[in-house]
């Protein structure tokens, strides 16, 4: 989060897990605690599965994506990302991961993979 908020402004990032429910359960609580401790402000729009984060005069959007099956790549198609986190990537279809990687076309974008379990 610090990397995204200090290197980019007005960009879009992806936070991905097998399901959006698992993302909200496993990733977002710790991330919110970290953001609060760092002085970041987050406004979540749960109905549209994203949050806008502000820090030091910068603002970026973080979309939530679930990669549970072969239909999931269509959910992330078409968006231009400056970075993406794939939680439990080993549980996601390869086609979803490939689409997420392909979406990271902003100069300097990065990928993070967690292969647990």
Language-model region placement:
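Phosphate/NTP-binding elements of NTP-utilizing enzymes
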Residues: 1-117
């Amino acid at each position: 989060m610090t990397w995204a908020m200090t290197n980019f402004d007005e960009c879009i990032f992806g936070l991905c897990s097998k399901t959006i429910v698992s993302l909200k359960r496993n990733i977002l609580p710790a991330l919110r605690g970290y953001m609060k401790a760092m002085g970041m402000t987050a406004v979540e729009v749960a109905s549209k599965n994203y949050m806008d984060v502000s820090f030091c005069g910068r603002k970026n959007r973080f979309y939530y994506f679930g990669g549970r099956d072969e239909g999931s790549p269509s959910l992330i198609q078409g968006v231009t990302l400056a970075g993406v986190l794939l939680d439990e990537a080993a549980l996601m279809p390869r086609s979803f991961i490939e689409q997420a990687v392909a979406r990271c076309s902003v100069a300097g974008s990065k990928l993070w993979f967690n292969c647990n379990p």
